[in-house]
Amino acid sequence: MTSTRKSNPIMKMVNHAFIDLPTPSNISMWWNFGSLLATCLLLQIITGLFLAMHYSPDTSSAFSSIAHITRDVNYGWIIRYLHANGASMFFICLFLHVGRGLYYGSFLLLETWNIGILLLLTVMATAFMGYVLPWGQMSFWGATVITNLLSAIPYIGTDLVQWVWGGYSIDKPTLTRFFTIHFTLPFIIVALTTLHLLFLHETGSNNPCGIISNSDKIPFHPYYTTKDILGLTLLLLLLMMLVLFLPDLLSDPDNYTPANPLSTPPHIKPEWYFLFAYAILRSVPNKLGGVLALLLSILILMAMPMLHKSKQQSMTFRPLSQLMLWLLTTTLITLTWIGSQPVNQPFIMIGQMASMTYFTTILILMPLASLTENKLLKWT
């Protein structure tokens, strides 16, 4: 008799996706981040749902409703901090997941890669909307600065900003629509994640060697489910350490002051996971140029398949390309640090140099390193 998981229509889909899925036998812990991201998403949706039950999307009561959740709601403090720090964990896993894709050449699976970039942009939009909801000083001024970037668009910029705000300044309509969009986007992320998986399972996973592994595959369960549980345990351990011991480590103290349109904070900055893009935005003196650089800092990932000049898919056996990727990594860390600093020297100069290095590494140095390696291996 056929097993239920192979005969039941719904179970059959689950079986093909997570149980009997043929998986390369040599994929490392770097392939663990997909399941960790799914866990983070589930955690964010569950905690967000409970927070939404007590949150009030109104400028007069939003800040106090957050205080009410933290002080009065049963276990409200842990739900709130799980949601806030869960977002940080989400982005740590996202950046590592994208980094793994760059290192092992997973961007050559075009559909999967492009949907992944779309997912990254959607998650960033969701996180930005969520940062505005507590209606603290940094929420208000962060929203003001970022939404104002739309005014750089020629002809329609000002009208577009006022349309997003729902008035002539950030007020109640802005908060209401940001809450609505923040609530809706995670479900769109779930749909995109399903598409991401669908396209991945069409081609099969890449592997550390970057070679076809059809001749050596093993079922996903129990081998990789067990392996994923280890990664999940470490992720939850790190998250719970943050939530229980250092819940405000990654948040801004200014956000514990209610939003005041008449008082500007000394240094407006977004959450830590946006600082690299914020530093690139600030490094261009022209407003429109800065906005374009900001967009390109993420959208440049879409060009990776075209910039791939190596005869090998993975960087495992390409030391020059590895060096370029680590240069890119250190540049991103530098940009993150610069984004958190005030706008004065030497930070302006360091930010401009790091921004130039970021784009130069991706557009020029990485393809050049690949071509050099081809030449050295006489693969031209």
Curated annotation (Swiss-Prot):
UniProt record similarity statement: Belongs to the cytochrome b family.
Cofactor mode of binding and number, as noted: Binds 2 heme b groups non-covalently.
PANTHER family with a match to the protein in the record: CYTOCHROME B
InterPro entries per record: Cyt_b/b6_C, Cyt_b/b6_C_sf, Cyt_b/b6_N, Cytb/b6-like_sf, Cytochrome_b, Cytochrome_b_C_euk/bac, Cytochrome_b_N_euk/bac, Di-haem_cyt_TM
Pfam families hit by this protein: Cytochrom_B_C, Cytochrome_B
Organism: Colobus guereza (Mantled guereza)
Residues the record lists as binding heme b b562: H83, H182
Record membrane topology: Multi-pass membrane protein
SUPFAM superfamilies: a domain/subunit of cytochrome bc1 complex (Ubiquinol-cytochrome c reductase), Transmembrane di-heme cytochromes
Function: Component of the ubiquinol-cytochrome c reductase complex (complex III or cytochrome b-c1 complex) that is part of the mitochondrial respiratory chain. The b-c1 complex mediates electron transfer from ubiquinol to cytochrome c. Contributes to the generation of a proton gradient across the mitochondrial membrane that is then used for ATP synthesis.
Record carries keyword Transcription: no
GO biological process: mitochondrial electron transport, ubiquinol to cytochrome c
Cofactor(s) required for function per UniProt: heme b
Transmembrane helix keyword on record: yes
Positions annotated to bind a ubiquinone: H201
Record's keyword terms, sorted: Electron transport, Heme, Iron, Membrane, Metal-binding, Mitochondrion, Mitochondrion inner membrane, Respiratory chain, Transmembrane, Transmembrane helix, Transport, Ubiquinone
More details: Heme 1 (or BL or b562) is low-potential and absorbs at about 562 nm, and heme 2 (or BH or b566) is high-potential and absorbs at about 566 nm.
Gene Ontology CC annotations of this record: mitochondrial inner membrane; respiratory chain complex III
Binding site for heme b b566: H97, H196
Superkingdom of the organism of origin: Eukaryota
UniProt subcellular location: Mitochondrion inner membrane
Gene symbol of the encoding locus: MT-CYB
CDD domains, sorted: cytochrome_b_C, Cytochrome_b_N
Protein name per UniProt: Cytochrome b
GO molecular function: metal ion binding; ubiquinol-cytochrome-c reductase activity
Transmembrane segments: 33-53, 77-98, 113-133, 178-198, 226-246, 288-308, 320-340, 347-367
